[in-house]
Structure formats: structure tokens, C-alpha cells
Amino acid sequence: MTRIMYWFSFLCMILSLFVLSTAKPCQAKEISVELVWKLGQAGWVEIQVTKGDYQLIIDATSRKLPAGSRLQLGWAGWAPIVQINHEEFRVLKESKLEIKGINSGNLSVKTPEDTATVYRGDLALSWQNSHWQVVNKVDSEDYLKGVVPIEMSNEWAIGGGAEALKAQAVAARTFLVRHTGNGEKAITDSPDIDQAYAGVLVEGEASVAVAATRDEILVDDQSKQPIEALYSSHSGGYTEDAKNVWGNSDINNVSHPDPYSEEVGGAANHWRFIVSAPVLGSTFGLGPVSKVELDKYPSGRVKSVRIEDGFGLSKTVTARTFVKKFYPFGQPIQKFAFLGSFFETRKIATSPDLFSKSGLPAFLGFQEKEQGPLLSKISSTARGPSSVSQPFGVFIFDGRGWGHGVGMSQWGAYHMSQLGYNYKEILSFYYNSTFLSKP
């Protein structure tokens, strides 16, 4: 009996070693984030240790950088240069350096033109193509603390949106895992490329959501792999099929009605853009436009726009191209901005009987003033009034939603949270054929 138990124990040990050796590896905790949002073309960078102690590795040497230490990195015209604290500037023998944390700390990074952004973790810098490439090496969960509050808002936790923040944390983590693998690939901090990441200074209530969902990601029912967890600000009341935006079919991101995104989101819920027929035409190399025709997807989003001028010349462009011509890049979002491809259009003639007493068309929704521009003098709501009247009319674009509309609508998630849905129910509504998993 003793011999049998011995062999049984030995067999169990061998089996356990086999299971451990063949288990799926967990995702790496440290990730690399290339800081391109504000530092993409930085020729001069200032770094300061704001908390903790760091080690500077430079030109095959190392030195300690206690809290308060400061570095300036630039270009001398023939080689990169560095200044450490108040020492003299010196030429770098190697065009790269690392700043590694000895203990838990923070680093402030800025260019002469921008305010400072503070990051956890380490920094690796290298001079490439006439600018400094700056990479933040940081724990993945700390990274998410700098993503969720800027992709959504810390204030949503107070307004009943705590579950929406959890849903955002899971979506952002899933996006991270899918795009970095086990940490071998870098991700950027840019919302135009990957996800918005703004470091320590934006951290707040959203960190609770990150902690509450730690390591949770969305995986596909069939493949068991992380999904493409796409999201945008506001779906306009109908999510879009991934194929119609990115060109590839995706069973996890399909088009469906989204009642939770209706009547929420301020300017994103309903926006209006006005442009004169001459300005619209000149934008696309045509004369004053007489007709605009829209080709749409089943969701109602515009697929392409056909523009025809008064001379019979026409041009057809994709909705994305059309929107980019008028999108308010770098400007505050407002209700008189062109925010997406979910829109209708109509033409209004510049007829005097359409004017309000103040001179501003009352039906356009503008705030009344004692003196206002005539409809014929409106060039566009982006440019404002013109000093010269034109008789060709204006086009009004009434739209809803903000962003591509694929996957989770952030405003819709917020509304669902306010209505009592939990983050798992929110994710289930927006992402098809998925389940939550911890790698």
C-alpha cells in the first residue's frame, strides 16, 4: 500500500509539472508606451524627478537622481546634448539614455511649448530623425489609470457612471493586451493611433474602476483570444459595423440600435453645421454647390457624398474624407461643429423672407443678438460670417454622434450605468459573442 501511494504521489507530481509547463503565459505587467501625443517631434525635452529616486544610465555610466533632479535634452547642431541639474551641457557619446526607478516614483516631462505631464515608471530616450523618441515603461494597470479618466471622465463616478468607468477599464485593458501581446510590442499615448494616455495628473476616481476590474479582458467566444475592443464617444443612437469603418468583418463589433445613446451627450447628441454653397464647392474644387446626395449604410451613417455644382460638375468622396474637411481638429467640441458621418443635409436659399428681425435666421438655432449676419453672409459655422453676400444659398448638416461609432458608445455606457446596469451588462450589450477572462 505504501508503495502504491508513493507511485501515486510521484505521478501527481509529474502531472503537475506538465500542467505548469504547458499553461498559457500571463500577459506581461510592464509595457512600453511611446509618447507621441505631445512629444512626437520634440527637439528639446525637460525631465524632472518629482517623486522617488531614479538611476540615470547614460554613456555606459550610471548615477543616482534623487527627487528634485532635473535633466534637459536637446540638439547642438551636430550631436544630442544633455544638462544634468546645473552642470554644464555635454555632448552625448551615445544618442540614447535611460531613467530607471530605484523605488516608486514619478517623472515630469515637458517641451518648451507645453505644460508638464507626469508619468509613473521609467523612461527611455533616443535621438531619432531629428527629434527625441520618448518611451514610458510602466506597469499595465498604472497605465490604465492614465487612460480611463481621459477617455471618459473621473466626474462620471460621482454622476452614477461608476459601472461605465469599469466597462471602459475592461475595454481599454483588452485593447492594450490585443495590441501589445505579452508586452513585446509598444503602444502609443495618442488617441488618434491607439488610446489616449495622460499619465499621473489625470488620475482620480477612475482608478477605483481599474482596480475593481484588475486583469479582466474581453475574449471571443470561439477563439478565446482578446477582441478588438473598439469604442467611441457617442454612437448617435446606432452602433456601426466594423467592416463599414475599417474594412474587415468583426463578429464582436456589429451594428445595432443603441437607445442608451439617445438624448445624452450634449453637443455629441445633436449637432448642426452650416456652410455656404460657394465655400462647400471650393473645398472640393467645384463651383457653388447646387446639390448634395448621400449614400448610406443600413445604420444611417453616410458612406459617401456626391457634390454637384451649378455648372454640372460633380465629385464623390467618402464620408470620412468629407468629414475631415470640416472636423474641428484641436478645437473644443460644440453643437455647431461637424462631428461625424451620421448626418442629414438640406439646402436653404438665401431669401430675405427667411430672416429674423435681428438679421439672423431664427430656425437655425443661433442665439439671437441685436445685430447679426444675414444668411447670405454666412460662410460656415466654423469660419463665421463673411463681409460679402452670396446668392447661392447654404447647406445645413444635422448630425448626431461623435466618432466612428464602432463598439462601445461611451455616452451610452454612462447612461446604462445611470439606469442601474453593471459593467458586465454594458460590455455584453456593446460587444457581441464575448466573455470576461483573466489571462
Model regions and ranges:
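Conserved, single-site charged/polar hotspot
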Residues: 2-439
